[in-house]
Each structure stands twice: as C-alpha cells, then as structure tokens.
C-alpha cells in the first residue's frame, strides 16, 4: 500500500480535503444534493465542512464531512467513504442519532426534529448488489407499504455500481468522484460535472489552499506519530501484565482506546 501523501494537484473528489472545499460552495452543494436525491431544492444555507458534534464529555464525538440545511429546514450530512468498514451501517445510525441530539435541546418537543438525510458516497459496493444507490427508510416489516414517518433517510452511493438503476447523470457523477480530471469533465454530458471541475481547478491553483492542505498533512503526520507512541506505551504495559484500567489511568487515555489497541495487537 502506498502511504505517500498526494500532491494537491493529484487529488480527486474522493479525497476529503478537495470534497469539502468543493461542497462548501452553496450552489454546487445544492445541485449535488438535487442530483443525488432527484428532488428540487430552492436554496441551501452555507454548508459547514468538518462540523464537530461532541455532546457528552465522556462520549464519542463525531466530525461530519459536510453538514447543510435547506430552505425547508431539512438537514443533509454527506460523507465521503473510501474504506470498506463493516461498521458502516452502525456509523450511519450513530451519526443520525448525534445529529438529532444536536438539533433538539432539552425540553423541546419531538416535533422539532427535522427531516434528515445521512448520505455516504462510497468508492466500493458495501452491499455487493451492483447498485449505484442504496436508500434506507424505516418501514413496517409486516406491511412494507407502511412507512414509519420518522423522516430519517440513510443513503449509500457506490462509485463501482454496475446495474442500470440510476440515470446517466448520477453514473457520470459517481465516475467523476474517482476520476476528477479536466479530460473527464470535458467529455461529460452532465453539466454539473463541468461546473464542479471549475471549482476543483480553482482550489488546486490556489496557493492559500495548497498551504492549508500541506498544514493538514503535517498535522495528520504528527497525530499518527503521537498515536504510534501511545500504542507502543500501551502494549509495553500490557505485556508487563498491567490491567487495562490501570493503563488507561496511568497514561491518561480513554479506556475504549486502550482496549481497541490491545485488541488490534492481539489479532496480529
């Protein structure tokens, strides 16, 4: 596996940095959502990229790639996913729950909860059915025409789809996610792709964006090194027979993190 960081010029939309910068454009974000959902959206508020929801001091917070509201108070969370993790459906559930808690304050009626979409754009087929789009909504098992009506929708888009289940615009857009080039955009029939490419080129040509990208890469490297050092300390104590709870206390680390590192170590 090649761990060498990409140059900003080599980024595709599947890369978080470029995806967030492109989706921070109100009009592009609105049109992407319209195309994915096949609905009309009059207006969206300024999209928030890398929105953090950390509601509980001792809980696990989340960072959302793109978080946006439209003129009807519908909430959209769009995530770019390149790693095929078996916990992806439960991650979608966890994101949904945190968004709900963030939307409604204590004492407010449940009616204040808004319609929400949690959308994962995946560079793999999680469900292995060949579809480009998988949409999930709570329905009655005994009567699948009966919808629960909690207004929560989870969608998983697949750039590797093979079925003829969506229109050509969606197919082209999903291909473009992994092949974000001027050549692809020029040959595309989807007008949205051509407009996204203009934004992509503006981001890649910006010295300010390049500095920001390089700064994030450096921070990621430092965090990985810090994580590696912490992992070595945990394993060293564990091999000495120190209890997990004691390791957590001694190193001032979350017990959940300590247990995960030990599980990973034992599975090698």
At which residue positions do the language-model features occur?
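Upstream accessory/linker segments immediately N-terminal to the RecA-like ATPase cores of bacterial MutS
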Residues: 142, 149-180, 187
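Short, charged alpha-helical interaction segments and adjacent helix-coil junctions
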Residues: 2-9, 17, 67, 71, ...
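Accessory alpha/beta interaction modules
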Residues: 1-153, 163, 222
